[in-house]
């Protein structure tokens, strides 16, 4: 069954992760070969966060992303107060996606998408009754921040899959570096 809605799930809170989202994840989603190339879909950025981070997120979205349709959901809006916030956010977006017959893309703030990757995944899966999952390598945030990736994203330059693979191999997270020992 073909679907004409895409929900982008963004669970993000805390200064470090909000900055990562605005510096890397959101610009990578907005590369011309990703969300802009899916204009025939209704796309909603579903942001799940804490109450004290809402204004910072709204400011970041209003600065350069005025054409994005977004919805912010907070922990207190959902009416729960236990410690398993991420699980509750996850259940909520799964339910909404199912009820509204929307395709779902996970976009945690530590993900960087190559140009065309979202478009390709949507076109590959839509209407076929399948899901696509792709593991992403953990990388050193210090290593990435020392690169010119942030500058390239701000200048709307295309970020290729090849470049991201090289970036991940050059900036391995410590847990990956010693995984085979």
Predicted regions and their residues:
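Short helix-terminating capping/connector loops at secondary-structure junctions
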Residues: 2-3, 36-43, 100
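Short, well-formed alpha-helical segments that are part of the catalytic scaffolds
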Residues: 16-37
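Conserved catalytic core of nucleotide-sugar-dependent glycosyltransferases
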Residues: 81-89, 94-95, 112-181
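Structural alpha-beta junctions
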Residues: 30-42, 63-74, 126-133
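Short loop/turn segments at strand-loop or loop-helix junctions that form parts
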Residues: 6-14, 50, 72-78, 134-136
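Active-site-proximal specificity loops/subdomain of glycosyltransferases
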Residues: 48-103
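Hydrophobic targeting segments
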Residues: 5-10, 29, 42-47
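Short beta-strand-to-loop acidic/aromatic patch adjacent to the donor-nucleotide binding site
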Residues: 99-114
